[in-house]
UniProtKB/Swiss-Prot annotation:
GO biological process, alphabetically ordered: inositol catabolic process
Reaction(s) the record says it catalyses: scyllo-inosose = 3D-3,5/4-trihydroxycyclohexane-1,2-dione + H2O
Cofactor(s) required for function per UniProt: glutathione; Co(2+); Mn(2+)
Domain of life of the source: Bacteria
Alphabetized HAMAP family for the sequence: IolE
UniProt KW keywords: Cobalt, Lyase, Manganese
Protein's name according to its UniProt entry: Inosose dehydratase
Pfam families for the chain: AP_endonuc_2 (PF01261)
Keyword Manganese: yes
Taxonomy of the source species: Bacteria, Pseudomonadati, Pseudomonadota, Gammaproteobacteria, Enterobacterales
Signal peptide start and end residues: none
Its EC number(s): 4.2.1.44
Family of this protein: Belongs to the IolE/MocC family.
Molecular functions per Gene Ontology: manganese ion binding; myo-inosose-2 dehydratase activity
Amino acid sequence: MNKDNVKLAIAPIGWTNDDMPELGSENTFQQIVSEMALAGFTGSEVGSKYPRDPAVLKPMLDIRGIQICNAWFSTFFANGQREKTIDEFVNHMNFLHAMGAKVIGCSEQSGSIQGLDKPILGDAKPCFSDEEWQRVAEGYNTLGRLAAEKGMQVCLHHHMGTGIQTTAEIDKFMSLVDERVFLLFDTGHAWYSEGGEAPMLAILKKYLPRINHVHLKDVRPPVIDQVRRDGLSFLDGVKKGTFTVPGDGVIDFRPVFKLLDDFGYKGWMVVEAEQDPALANPFEYAVKARKYIRETAGI
C-alpha cells in the first residue's frame, strides 16, 4: 500500500472497553497512548479515559506522535430522537474538529442489542420499518451536511446487533443517503454478520468509492460457533474472544489491502479489536498487529 495515502491507527478498546469498563480498568490513559506509540501507530480513536478538553488532550498526544482520527458517536434517529441526536452531534463534531480529525464515525443505536443480554446471532436485533429508515436517512443527510460545513465527513459504522448490520441493511442505508454520507468499513463486523470472507470482501468492493474509514478487526470462528450454539450476547462473545487483531484470527487481510490500494484509498486504517486485556495483553497484541500489517500491506 501507499504509505503517503494510508495512515495507521489503533483504538483504545483493546486496552479498556467502554461497554464493559471492568475490562482493563487498571490501564491508564497515559499507558494506553504510550503503548500505542511504542507499537508503531500514529493515530488513535477516542476512549472513555481520554480527556475531552482539546487543550489538555492534544499536547499529551503530540508528544507521543499520536493524532485523533475518529471517535464513536451514537445516533438515535429511528426512534425519533432527531433534535437531541443533532445537538449532541454538533458538540461531538466540534471536539473532533478541534483535535484535527476529519472523520466522524456514527452508529445508529435505536433498538441496538449490542450491549444487552440477548443472543447476538438470532432474530433479536432491530429491523427498521420504512418510516424508521426514512428518519435514519434524513438524519444522516443532516449530519453529513453539518460535517461538510466543517470540512469533515460522516460515516456509518455497520455493527452487530444494530439495525444496520447485514449486507442488505448496508445496501438499504447507502441507497437512501446522499453523497455526503460515507461508510465506515469494518472487516470484523462484516465477517461476523455475513459468515465469511467472500461476503465481507463483496461489501468492500461495492462501496470502495464511499468508504472513508476502515476498521481492521480479525475474528475467531470457533468462538463465533460457540456464540451461535449457546445463544450468547455480543459482549459475552467479546469476553470469550470473538475478535482479535489482524494476523491472529482467520481473516486474510491481503485482499482487503489490495482492494483499498488499487482503488487509491486515502485515509486511516484502524486496528479496532476488543477483547479481554487480561487474556490478550494489549501492548503485545498491538505489536503483533503492527508487524502483520507491515508484512502484508508494506506500510
